[in-house]
Amino acid sequence: MTALLKTENLSKTYPGFRLDNVSLRVEPGEIVGFIGRNGAGKSTTLKSLLGFVHPDSGETEFFGMPFRGNENAIKQQIGFVPGGVDYYPKSKIRTLVGVTSRFYKNWDEKVCDELLDRFGIPQSKTPSELSAGMKVKLALTLALSHGAKLLILDEPTSGLDPVSRDELLDILLDLRKDGIGILFSTHIISDLERAADRIVYIRNGNIAADRTVGEFESDYRLLFYTGRPEGIELIGERAERDGFTALVKSETGLGEKAGLEDIMLHLERSTK
C-alpha cells in the first residue's frame, strides 16, 4: 500500500535551531500523533512538508509522488488545518466557502453543505460569531469538501474546551474509518491517547521515537519511590509530594502500568 505521506531526512536550519534529519510517514486510515513540547520543531516540520518554508535537505512524497514538481496536484488531495484558525471575521461563511471552492478541482458542494449541517454551522453566520471549536469544525469542512485523502492538523485542539476537543476526536476517528490518513500535531497528550495509532515524538529538532501507543505502553512502567533504588535505570525522575516517580524499563518488573501521558512527560524530563 502506498503511503499517503513519506518524508526522509528533512532538515532546516535557523539561527539557534536545527530540524535534523526528520523522517516520518502516514498510511491510509492511520492517525499519527506528532508530539513534542513548544519549540521542538513540530510546526517547522509541517511547514517544510507543505512547502511553506524551503527545507535545506530531505525528500518528501505524497501519494507516491515527489512533492517537488507535483505541488498543485498534491495540494488538491490534502487538507491542512492550521493552529489558531482565523478568517476574515465579518465575512459570511457562505462567502468563505465560495472563495475556497475556486482553488479545488474536485470541490463537492453537496459534501460541504452536509458537513456544515452536521457540525451545526449556518452559512449566514460570520467567523466572529463562532466559538473556537466551531472554527476548527469549519476548517475541517473546508479541508474535506474537496475529497482530501490526507489531513494535516497543526495543534487543532489548542484553546478548545474538553467537550469540544472530545467532539473533534470523534470526527477524526470517523474519518479514519473512511481510510483518510491524519497527521495530528499537538502537545495535548490525552488527545493522542484516545485517538492515535502511532506516536512520532520530536525533541530538540530530532525524532526521538516513532512507535505505536501500545509499544510505548509495553516498553515502560512507572515507579514510585522514596529512596533511590540501586542498579535500576531511572528515566525522567520527577519529584512528587511524598517521594519521586520515574520510568523504568518493563523488563525490570518494577512499578505499575504507565499511561501515555506519564511516559511522554518523563521522557521529556530525561537527559538521554
Regions found by a protein language model. Give the residues of each.
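C-terminal coupling/interaction segments
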Residues: 235-272
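Walker A (P-loop) phosphate-binding loop of ABC-type ATPase nucleotide-binding domains
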Residues: 37-41
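Conserved ABC transporter NBD signature motif
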Residues: 58-66, 73-74
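Helix-to-loop junction immediately C-terminal to a conserved catalytic motif
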Residues: 50
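Conserved beta-strand
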Residues: 7-10, 17-27, 58
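ABC-family P-loop ATPase nucleotide-binding domains
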Residues: 76, 82-138
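Catalytic Walker B motif of ABC-type/P-loop ATPase nucleotide-binding domains
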Residues: 151-155, 160
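ABC transporter nucleotide-binding domain
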Residues: 167-247
